[in-house]
C-alpha cells in the first residue's frame, strides 16, 4: 500500500420551518420544496435554470479559484464533491451539518488525528470512471505532493486552506482511506467538504494545467461549456448517486452590476439572480417575482490595519464602531435584506449571543473615545472597497454610507475601489489592495470552521489586519483540537467576544442572502448557508 507524506506547501491562497422555502412573493405560486432527504427525481423534466451571479465566474478546476464562495456555491459544488458535504435540504432554521458524500462514514482514532473513511460504493465520475480509494489518493497527491506530475504550486497554495492540516494519507483497501492530520482537528470532516475530488482519468487526459477547460467530478451537474469568466453551462448528471437533479441544464452568467441583473431577470435573459438590488425588491414582488431569504453565516465588515496608527489604538477602532448607523444601512439602504451587526459573531451561528451586541449607534461616545485617544480633531484614512463579488451586497453604497457616518465624528475616509478578484488576490498574500489602511469585504467565519483562524488568528496567511490576541489564539487552538462540537462552539463564542471588544474590524451587517426568482422556478430550499442544493429545483415551461 502506498503511504503519502505531505510535503510542506507555502500558502498563498487565498427562522424558517424545517421544510419551508422563504418565497415571499404575494400572488404568485410558492416554491415547491422537496421533502427532506428525498431523492431529486429524474432528469429531463426540469428545464434550464439561468442564474445571474454577482461576480466574475471561477476557474472551474477543483479549487474553484477567483470568485469566492459564490463560485463554489454555483459552480464548484455542482460539478464536484468531497468526501463530505453540507446537508442543505433539512433543518433550514439552523446552520447545516456535515454528512457523508463520497465517504459514507468515518471514524477517528484515540489520538484524534487518524481518520478512517469508508468510501461510498457504486459512484461514477461524470466521464464514467469509477470512484474509489485510488481516486482519493490521486487527488490528494495533486494538491499536496510536490513530486506528483499533476501537482502545481497554484493548486497546492489554494488547497492549503482546507487540506493543509493533512500530514499523511493512504489507501488501506479499495473502499477505505486513512488520513492523518498534523494536529488534532475536530472539524476535519467539515474541511473535507471543500477538498473536491476530480476524475483521475480526466486530469491525466488534459493535464492539471488544462483541466479547467474540461472539468469532471461526481456532482449533480456535469460541465458542458464556458466563456471564461463570463458564463458556464452545465447539464444534469443523470447517473448522480443521490438521484438525477430535476433540471436539465444549469447556466451561470456573470452580471456584476445589480441593475443589469434586474434587467436580465425582467427580460427573461435569466430566471434567477443573486443579490437583487434592494431598491428593486418591492417592484419585483409586485411583478410576481419570488424573493427568497434566510439568515446565514455572513459578515460584511472592514478589516482595519491594526499595525498602523491610529487603528493600532483600540479606542479608535471602538470609536469607529460606535460612529456608524448599522440599522439605517440594514433597513433603509438594504431594505431589510440584512441585519445590523453589533458584534463579531454572525447571527446565524452558534457563536452568536444577543448579550454580546455591543456597538449601538452612539456618535457622542465615538467622539469621546477619539478625544481620549488624542484625536479630538479626527484623522484621515483610506479603505479599499470591491465593486461587487461574492456576498458583498452593495459594497460601494454601503461604504459611502459609512464614509458619511465616520465623517460626522471627524474620521475622513478615502474610498478606493477595485474588483473583487484583485482584492482577495492581495489578501491571499497578506496584503491590502491599493495600499489602503483597511479593506471592505464579506466573509463567512464558520463554513468551514477552518476559516475562523484564517481571519482572527495571528498565524494566518490572510493576516491583512495584523490583529493579534494570545487569548484568541489559545481559544482557537483549543476549539480546533476538540472533537466535541459543543466545546468548540463555546470556545468560538469566547474568542469572538474578545474580538468584539478588541474591535479589529468595523462590524457592519449580516446579509440575509436574498435572491430573486422567476415565478416559473420551483423547488428551492433556502438553507442558513452560503451554499445551495440545486437538485430539487426545476423551471416550469
Place the predicted regions along the sequence by residue:
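Aromatic- and charge-enriched surface segment that lines or borders ligand/interaction sites
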Residues: 104-149, 178, 310-312
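A bilobed periplasmic-binding-protein/Venus flytrap-type ligand-binding module shared by bacterial periplasmic
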Residues: 235-238, 296-319, 323
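Detector for C-terminal structural segments
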Residues: 41, 227, 324-350, 394-403, ...
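Ligand-site clamp/hinge motif
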Residues: 206-212, 231, 237-283
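Surface-exposed binding/hinge segments that line
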Residues: 118, 137, 153-202
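Structural transition elements
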Residues: 340-373, 390-397
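Gly/Pro-rich hinge or "lid" segments in bacterial periplasmic/extracellular proteins
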Residues: 87-93, 187-245, 249
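N-terminal lobe/hinge region of extracytoplasmic solute-binding protein
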Residues: 52-110, 216
